[in-house]
Amino acid sequence: MNIDDTTIERCMMKLLSERSAGSSICPSDVARALASDETVWRALMPAVRKVAARLAEAGVVRITRGETTLSPDEIDHGPIRLRRGPGFVAD
């Protein structure tokens, strides 16, 4: 299964649109929405984080750990959450 960055981004935006403005999602929510097989969704996690980093740089999403907003270069390890950024536009 080949899942590209555009597909990951669309899924991420859809999941964030379905939540209230102050809510967050886990990157694994995105991966699991794209692939139900654990081996496959786990393999998608680096790509999901890469897309999240790109969208964070553009201000579309915020990457957080607890209540702290992280810069994209701080997400190579550890738990993170994704929230709507100031440039987020709901569908």
For the regions a protein language model found, what residue spans apply to each?
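Basic amphipathic alpha-helical segments that dock to polyanions
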Residues: 54-58
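Long, charged, low-complexity intrinsically disordered regions
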Residues: 2-5, 89-91
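Short, cationic-aromatic polyanion-contact patches
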Residues: 66-91
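Short acidic, hydrophobic short linear motifs in intrinsically disordered regions
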Residues: 23-34
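Positively charged, polyanion-binding regions of nucleic-acid-associated proteins
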Residues: 3-24
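Short, positively charged loop/turn segments that connect secondary-structure elements
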Residues: 35-50
